[in-house]
Swiss-Prot record:
Residues 265-317 are annotated as: Essential for its function. It comes from the Eukaryota. It is a single-pass membrane protein. Keywords: Host cytoplasm, Membrane, Signal, Transmembrane, Transmembrane helix, Transport. One of its GO terms (cellular component) is host cell. InterPro entries: GATA_zinc_finger. The chain crosses the membrane at residues 230-250. It comes from Plasmodium falciparum (isolate 3D7). Residues 18-30 have a biased composition (Polar residues). Residues 1-32, 277-317 are annotated as: Disordered. May interact with MESA. May interact with J-dot compartment protein PF3D7_0801000. This is EMP1 trafficking protein-7. The P.falciparum Export Element (PEXEL) motif, also known as the vacuolar transport signal (VTS), is a pentameric sequence (RxLxE/Q/D) required for the translocation of proteins across the parasitophorous vacuole membrane. In the endoplasmic reticulum, the motif is cleaved after the leucine residue and the N-terminus is N-acetylated. The gene is PTP7.
Length: 317
């Protein structure tokens, strides 16, 4: 009987150990699953925030494609891929690459007369006005900077700058700036080319970090990573999801917000208490210094009075 009782005790102990091991393994599995769920929620929130930022970049992407035919541009399907209205990611790219300015200017030239806000997108010019286009292309536009002088005698001491657009260059309309320096008479006009060293100096002054950032931004804008009509179509749904996620985050983390508020209050009270103590100590020190100064002044006055009295007595004697 004693042996049977010992066997039963051993079996019960083994069962208890197995139960505790099973419970601990279940707890470990539950904690692992909770950790995975938290990681998934964090990844979901990060992904949602990135998508929202992406949509903000594409928010003004109300562009359409047009085709060009006989000098006219009409609204239509994507044939040549000429973009009329730029998206937010493509705006101000001339800031990083000024050589693209001519290409943008060609798309936005006023003599094409593209009305972006009309449905038919009709041209303001007629088809027979090719001569006017040739006139605009052939005649150089010159800007003369006149001197800001009042006296006619000082007119020979200024530098006149003329900006001339050379349209004869192939596929490139760059401005050649020439400086006319007046030396005495009109016959002694000296024609000097404008030294184009400003770009080199500015590139030397730019740090490497800014240069890398400029190239990186141009790479992103060149591949149009933030230009997606699908995201524009899904904008309302993703915006609602983003708002819902932010509200759930705030509601779920109310206790952390309350704890931070209480901690801030405690820190403020501690700082105010220390500040009051310092002010009281400073006031006490100032009062003590004032009292000492008053006592010293009184002692000096008494000494002066005593000296005066002694001098008077000595004179009488």
């Amino acid at each position: 009987m004693a042996k049977d009782s010992q066997k039963n005790l051993n079996v019960s102990n083994n069962n208890n150990v197995q139960c505790t091991m099973g419970r601990s393994s279940q707890n470990i599995n539950k904690s692992d699953s909770k950790g995975k769920i938290k990681r998934c929620t964090y990844a979901y929130k990060i992904l949602l925030c990135t998508i929202f930022i992406w949509i903000c970049q594409c928010f003004y992407n109300k562009s359409y494609y047009v085709y060009k035919k006989d000098g006219r541009r009409n609204k239509g399907k994507k044939i040549l891929g000429i973009r009329i209205n730029k998206s937010l990611a493509e705006m101000d790219h001339t800031k990083y690459h000024p050589e693209y300015y001519d290409e943008v200017q060609e798309n936005y030239d006023p003599y094409y007369g593209v009305n972006q806000y009309s449905d038919e997108c009709e041209s303001y010019k007629s088809e027979d006005d090719d001569s006017e286009e040739e006139y605009y292309n052939s005649t150089p536009r010159v800007t003369v900077l006149e001197p800001q002088t009042e006296n006619s005698e000082d007119e020979e001491n200024y530098e006149k700058t003329i900006v001339d657009e050379l349209n004869e260059l192939p596929n490139d309309k760059k401005a050649l700036i020439l400086s006319y320096i007046r030396n005495g008479n009109d016959n002694n006009m000296q024609l000097l080319p404008y030294a184009n060293n400003n770009k080199q100096n500015t590139q030397e002054n730019i740090s490497r970090n800014k240069e890398f950032f400029r190239h990186f931004v141009d790479f992103i804008k060149g591949y149009k990573l933030f230009d997606s009509p699908v995201l524009n179509a899904l904008l309302p749904f993703i915006f609602i999801a983003f708002v819902y996620c932010t509200i759930t985050m705030l509601v779920g983390n109310v206790r952390y917000i309350i704890a931070l508020y209480i901690l801030a209050k405690i820190l403020k009270m501690h700082y105010d208490y220390k500040h009051k103590e310092n002010n009281n100590n400073n006031n006490n020190n100032n009062n003590n210094n004032n009292n000492n100064n008053n006592n010293n002044n009184n002692n000096n006055n008494n000494n002066n009075n005593n000296n005066n009295n002694n001098n008077k007595k000595s004179k009488k004697n």
